[in-house]
Amino acid sequence: IAMVMAMLTQAFRYAYEPFVFGKSRDKDNKQVYAQAMKFFIIFTLVAFLAVMFYLDILRYIIGRDYWPGLRVVPIVMAAEIFMGIYFNLSFWYKLIDETRWGAYFSLIGCTILVAMNVLLIPKYGYMACAWAGFTGYGVAMLLSYFVGQKKYPIRYDLKSIGCYVLLAAILYVIAEYVPIGNIYLRMAFRTLLLSLFVAYIIKRDLPLSQIPVINRFIRK
């Protein structure tokens, strides 16, 4: 189920790499990269919430024997978001021809992942594996960001991104910890929460007038 996020990040990688190098000579390229990062995070958060909110339904695509393992899904999906952000950040060292940094970050992240697996799996099982991926990708992402800001500074809209992450986290916690026994009411409640997040996106960064097809009706 968590592979939904992996597929999204993989699709993004295929589309984004030629886009980055095509924009590398434009004067506003850094602004475009910052916007791409912001919308990547926004839409992966939408995917995260959608999967987690409807996990009670999605779990039926796998066998019942695997249901206890579904608790790793949010951790693995968050790790995939980190990996996608890391990939998004990774172009700075390619653009300035210092690709050795990519090897450094990957080696550090991989070392953390392997070490956590070796040390923690015997005691905590597959949960340790999920947290190892989360931590390894997270560290590589942070290293790439902070070193990149010194080598090839890009002004990411951290305030706006932080608001989206905080809102998504709040909605996720509400969905998880508000007890609603009836599955139909629970799905309706979670759909409302997801709609609130989408409405926030539209209000802040994606006005209806900018959406193809819909904008025709608004203009009328």
Predicted regions and their residues:
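Alpha-helical transmembrane segments
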Residues: L89-D97, Y145-K159
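Specific pore-lining/lateral-gate transmembrane helices of multi-pass inner-membrane transport
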Residues: I1-S106
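Interhelical loop/hinge segments that connect adjacent transmembrane helices in multipass membrane
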Residues: A15, F19-Q31, K151-V165, I211-R216
